[in-house]
Amino acid sequence: MKVLKSIYKVMGCAILAASLSSCVNDWLDVAPSDGTDAGAALTSSSDLDAARTGMYKALKGNSSLVDYYGQQFFVYGDVHAGDDYQYNYIGGSNRANFYYDMNYQTASEFNTSTVSWQSPYVVIGRANRIIAAAEGGKLSDAVEAKAKIEQYAAESKVLRALAHFDLVRIYGKPYTEDQGASLGVPLVIGVLESNAKPARSTVAEVYTQVVKDLTEAISSNALATETKPGYVSVWGAKAILSRVYLNMGDYANALSVAEDIIKNSGAALWTRDQYFKAWDASTPNESEFLFRLNVAGSDDNNDLNGIGNLQQRDGYKEMVATKKFVDMLTSDPKDVRNDMFLPATASKEVEKYGTNKVFLNKLRGQGGDLRNVTIVPIIRLSEVYLTAAECAFRNNDKTKAVEYLNDLVKNRTTTEAFLATVDNITLERILIERRKELIGEGQRYFDALRNNETITRYTSEADKGWHKTLSKEAQSFNRDYFKAIAAIPQAEINANPNIKQNTGYGE
């Protein structure tokens, strides 16, 4: 597959030729299933509309390209940690074991089946194409379609920011480790010349651009104020911005944005009675979703390789909750999130996991069809409450931290002992609640890195929980271990000598 060459063809130019395989390059080099020629000029708002569809499709992926929110980003964000959600080595089929086993040594092992690289840059390329056309002033209906054009440009800036943000968290050190001084990823914020070979920007430079894109989109007042499934609104943009500030350790700004969402978005936490049914793909409860993808139908589903089928007991069943996580969650039998898991049924898995509920049942698919996972969460209101609680605590406002944490907990359990007080609230307590709430949504690993946690799968062969035997380095590690961040795919290094590889990886 052509990695950045294909990406920049989507932008209207070809650079950084690289070849990994030939499985999906046709999808990138021709019209992106959006009714537009990838190299044709955008001359009207209707052209932008079609290009916008292609941009969102790249975020979701398809059955051949699942290296972003179609599958791989969620696997990376949860299974690379492996302390709450592990590879199911009993019944899995090696689709989610790469970052769990951590046996990789060379950059050539990183490609679209193992890491998010190509698709985020496709999103960026398509976003740049829309922004350039929208802001170029040459669209045939620039006056009469002004509001629509500005909205599409603002959405494109949000998705460009999201893709850069996700990339820099995978390939760069956490911002909180060195205030962004180390290398991040190439910033692509416009159409590049055909001979361009961009170097990696620093983590700080990438974050600066991410914040700039998000704040410009928000302040443009062009984003929709009503949240609609499949598209980003002003509240989705603000939620992403709050997450970005949190990852930067900018707790004051993260709290400010989170509180704006809580007070003014009109979104509401699911109640305990609503929680399980809210994830029903046929009749989803939208009140918590600030930004989710709408994957439905043969045009944009990820077929059996999608994240829903990977998680589900009746699908590829690649991942299971760890014993440590199950013990943590079941310590409160009245917590409704216990209902989000199913027990094993296959004999070998029953032998290993017993009657414990280990298979996550969030992404259930529409009508039982696990290829049509219509609910793919990018960010929910519950995360915003947890961000507000964490940031208030870090800013020494325990009263406010208790308020936001308990607002969530009261909607998940009736056990009063799990409610926090000013006297007993701790950062650990807030982070544990975050783990319970967001499992399977791709955030655990990044939270561990930004907080400089030691990720511990197990430390004793005599007490491994449900883990298989792992290398010593994979049993317990922190962000100092070179494998804590991914290698830049070797094909990119070969094509562009300006891209420096992450330390520790051979070819």
Language model features: what each stretch is:
Residues S45, A50-R52, K60-S63, E205, ...:
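Extended ligand-binding clefts on enzyme/binding-domain cores
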Residues V3, S22-D78, K277-W279, Q311-Y316, ...:
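Membrane-proximal, proline-rich intrinsically disordered regions
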Residues S93-Y171, S201, S219-L223, R371-V376, ...:
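Conserved, well-structured interaction surfaces
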Residues D34-L42, V66-N88, G172-A181, V185, ...:
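Short, surface-exposed recognition loops and adjoining beta-strand edges that mediate ligand/DNA contacts
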Residues M1-S21:
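Sec-dependent bacterial lipoprotein signal peptides
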